[in-house]
């Protein structure tokens, strides 16, 4: 069994009052729809025309990671789990000029969007990550459903009833019902030759072994393909975001970092891609997610201006430490928060959001563009093991949810998986996903382009 990494110590936290939860959730409600009169919404007893039952009791005064089992209700043709819901009344009760919501959708949305479960859970895997198996998404089977968006849709329905006005979802460009963020973590540029060469040697195919070595010495590596990756996304009118890993030495725990060094030649190639409209961001190495000095040193290596984007190598993230490190370093956006083990919604939300700072009781200033699907998730002995023809059919229901709510589909496809030799989660599967996104009218945007459409926290 691989070693399990312990969570960091639980730091002091600010009280999480009903007002705190309401403010955080209504802020994101106002970002998901245009011109939302959030002042109309309050908890029962405050005389607001739209009231939400306060069903969380003293849950948020404690540090338990998991609430009681959710109550499942039908909403918008979908079975949706509602936490903090006793289920004794209809979900939404409408009378002239008023609306009552019997489930505490504010507390439920706050619980999921803030990442409460992983902040207060001690569960971590060998990479220091909160494991999918420990999540409520896994326990109740809703990882591919953006549950928080359904909660906000309940609020939307109530507001429309009270005001008589239709709330329009956020738009991403002329005629674009949702957005797509296409990204590539640059872990390996020099190692395509290793697996076939080792296989030839083990099998005793000495001629093949010699040919593999000769090709390695005389030809560019098949994974040294940044320009080809950029061209592949450009076919769909998209720009890629390349997350660059600045450390080539393994982490202290032996986990590999990059197989390349940041040479002047590589920087020239990246600069040329940036001039073509592609984006360069930081892929912070092993050991940076819990060390500000290490992280900020790498930020300065890769990002030549204040701000910029980040995704941590191996999706490492310690919820009690990492958000504060990102915030202190002045990063503009992050795109780490997805489960390595399963595609879907780690925070049950298909829009970007401002992570919650438990120490201050308010939102951080940096922006999270959650990760929905990673190529390695789809075909890996440790994760899912989808067949070559099963990838797109498995993803379409999740992608359709993002389209339904006008969210952002974040795709991570490593450059090494553009190698034609990869038939499991390789270029064919990537092009199938891109074709679906383009066919549904997605606006392809870089991380900075997405961030620029949102106000600061």
What residues fall within each predicted segment?
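Electropositive, surface-exposed helix/loop patches at the edges of structured domains
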Residues: 277-289, 294-297, 301-302, 312-330, ...
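Catalytic domains of cell-wall/extracellular-matrix polysaccharide-remodeling enzymes
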Residues: 22, 26, 286-365, 411, ...
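Terminal accessory/targeting
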Residues: 1-260, 351, 358-457
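Metal-dependent polysaccharide deacetylase catalytic core of the NodB/CE4 family, i.e.
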Residues: 188-192, 224-321, 343, 415
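Short, surface-exposed, charge-dense and proline/glycine-enriched linear segments
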Residues: 199-202, 270-280, 310-318, 334-346, ...
């Amino acid at each position: 069994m691989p070693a399990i990494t312990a969570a960091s110590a639980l730091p002091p936290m600010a009280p999480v009052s009903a007002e705190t939860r309401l403010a955080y959730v209504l802020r994101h409600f106002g970002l998901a729809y245009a011109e939302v009169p959030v002042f109309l919404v309050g908890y029962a007893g405050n005389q607001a025309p739209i009231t939400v039952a306060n069903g969380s009791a003293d849950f948020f005064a404690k540090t338990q990671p998991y609430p009681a089992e959710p109550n499942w209700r039908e909403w918008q043709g979908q079975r949706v789990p509602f936490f903090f819901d006793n289920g004794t009344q209809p979900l939404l009760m409408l009378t002239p000029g008023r609306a009552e919501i019997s489930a505490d959708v504010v507390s439920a949305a706050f619980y999921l969007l803030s990442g409460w479960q992983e902040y207060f859970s001690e569960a971590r895997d060998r990479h220091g990550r909160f494991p999918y198996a420990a999540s409520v998404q896994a326990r109740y089977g809703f990882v591919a459903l953006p549950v928080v968006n359904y909660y906000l849709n309940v609020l939307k329905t109530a507001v429309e009833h009270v005001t008589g006005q239709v709330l329009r979802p956020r738009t991403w460009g002329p005629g674009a019902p949702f957005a797509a963020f296409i990204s590539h973590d640059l872990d390996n540029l020099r190692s395509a030759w290793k697996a076939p060469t080792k296989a030839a040697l083990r099998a005793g195919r000495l001629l093949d072994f010699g040919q593999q070595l000769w090709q390695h010495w005389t030809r560019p590596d098949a994974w040294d393909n940044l320009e080809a990756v950029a061209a592949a996304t450009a076919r769909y009118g998209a720009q890629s975001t390349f997350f660059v890993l600045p450390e080539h030495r393994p982490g202290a725990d032996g986990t590999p970092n990059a197989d390349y060094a940041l040479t002047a030649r590589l920087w020239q190639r990246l600069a040329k891609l940036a001039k073509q409209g592609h984006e360069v961001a930081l892929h912070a190495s092993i050991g940076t997610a819990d060390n500000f000095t290490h992280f900020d040193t790498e930020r300065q290596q890769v990002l030549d201006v204040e701000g910029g984007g980040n995704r941590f190598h191996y999706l490492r993230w310690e919820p009690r430490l990492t958000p504060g490190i990102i915030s202190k370093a002045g990063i503009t956006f992050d795109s780490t928060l997805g489960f390595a083990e399963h595609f879907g919604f780690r925070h049950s939300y298909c829009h970007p959001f401002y992570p919650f700072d438990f120490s201050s009781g308010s939102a951080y200033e940096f922006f999270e563009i959650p990760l929905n699907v990673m190529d390695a998730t789809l075909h890996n002995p440790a994760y899912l093991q989808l067949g070559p023809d099963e990838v797109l059919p498995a993803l379409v229901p999740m992608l359709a949810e993002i389209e339904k709510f006008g969210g952002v589909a974040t795709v991570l496809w490593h450059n090494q998986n553009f190698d034609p030799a990869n038939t499991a989660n390789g270029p064919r599967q990537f092009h199938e996903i891109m074709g679906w996104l383009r066919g549904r009218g997605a606006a392809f945007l870089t991380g900075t382009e997405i961030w620029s459409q949102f106000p600061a926290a």
